[in-house]
């Protein structure tokens, strides 16, 4: 099973490589496979590589043993099983350092088949003691695989309420996936809020998405094939419900159409969706005049 489905972000998320190529998404899918398209961007890797964790932080996150509660379940694991990691200071509170570390369940299973555990932690910047934790199981398969630089911490100003700022963690898959999918997504963002010693997820969304709208992208000579790709961004809105501010989710979309004996056409547009906190998590409550293109 893939990692949990996720949510939009500020600043702008990594742009899928398909957007930065002269090929349309449909034809790029033929050459590389859609999951490969969304997985291959180096922008994400460069961002994560600038925020490596120190040995003390990794050891502290690995040593945590907790059970139950909103933060998930975690047992102490060997540091040698680290698969991916990233750390950075938390601008909201200089006394806190953030860490996101993924561990393998064992030391022998090959990449692409591993059972993993993601841990997102707040650490005391001075002592490296873990003060709050979130744990999430992840299972690799043909559509989901982690690399060493697959994690990114998002410290944008997600001010949900006075004195409550959420932490974002983005998980980027490097799996190639199926060669001719109808839908693909990547860069899964989870927003977490601190509740005592636990970090609780309140919003999850994928930041890069692709889908087949019409036709068969894997038929190289076909015309009238329509595909759509999008990057999602998140911003705080003014209304407050159940104690937390609404969130505006914006999709910047590119629709590509193959045309016989002509250059493929591309059309750009933007769609907006409002997410509202229901006391447990953020859920969609309104859509643009046109239907939201990628479901909820």
Language model: regions and residue ranges:
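N-terminal secretory signal peptides that target proteins for export/translocation
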Residues: 1-25
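Acidic, small-residue rich beta-repeat scaffolds with periodic aromatic anchors
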Residues: 42-76, 181-296
């Amino acid at each position: 099973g893939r990692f949990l489905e996720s949510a939009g972000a500020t600043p702008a998320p990594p742009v899928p490589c398909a957007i930065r190529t002269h090929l349309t998404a449909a034809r790029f899918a033929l050459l590389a496979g859609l999951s490969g398209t969304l997985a291959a961007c180096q922008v994400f890797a460069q961002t994560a590589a600038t925020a490596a964790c120190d040995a003390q932080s990794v050891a502290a996150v690995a040593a945590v043993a907790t059970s139950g509660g909103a933060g998930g379940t975690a047992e102490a694991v060997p540091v040698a099983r680290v698969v991916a990691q990233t750390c950075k200071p938390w601008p909201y509170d200089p006394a806190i350092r953030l860490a996101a570390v993924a561990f393998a369940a064992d030391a022998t299973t090959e990449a692409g088949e591993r059972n993993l555990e993601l841990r997102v932690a707040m650490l005391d910047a001075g002592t490296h003691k873990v003060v709050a934790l979130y744990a999430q199981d992840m299972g690799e398969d043909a559509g989901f695989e982690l690399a060493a630089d697959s994690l990114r911490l998002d410290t944008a100003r997600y001010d949900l309420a006075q004195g409550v700022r959420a932490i974002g963690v983005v998980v980027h898959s490097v799996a190639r996936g199926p060669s001719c999918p109808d839908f693909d997504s990547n860069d899964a963002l989870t927003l977490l809020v601190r509740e005592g010693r636990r970090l609780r997820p309140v919003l999850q969304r994928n930041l890069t998405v692709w889908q087949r709208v019409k036709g068969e992208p894997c038929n190289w000579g076909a015309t009238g094939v329509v595909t759509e790709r999008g990057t999602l961004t998140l911003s705080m809105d003014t209304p407050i419900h159940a104690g937390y501010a609404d969130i505006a989710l914006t999709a910047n979309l590119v629709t590509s159409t193959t045309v016989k004996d002509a250059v493929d056409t591309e059309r750009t547009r933007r769609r907006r969706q409002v997410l509202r906190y229901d006391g447990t998590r953020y859920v969609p409550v309104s859509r643009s005049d046109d239907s939201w293109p990628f479901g909820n």
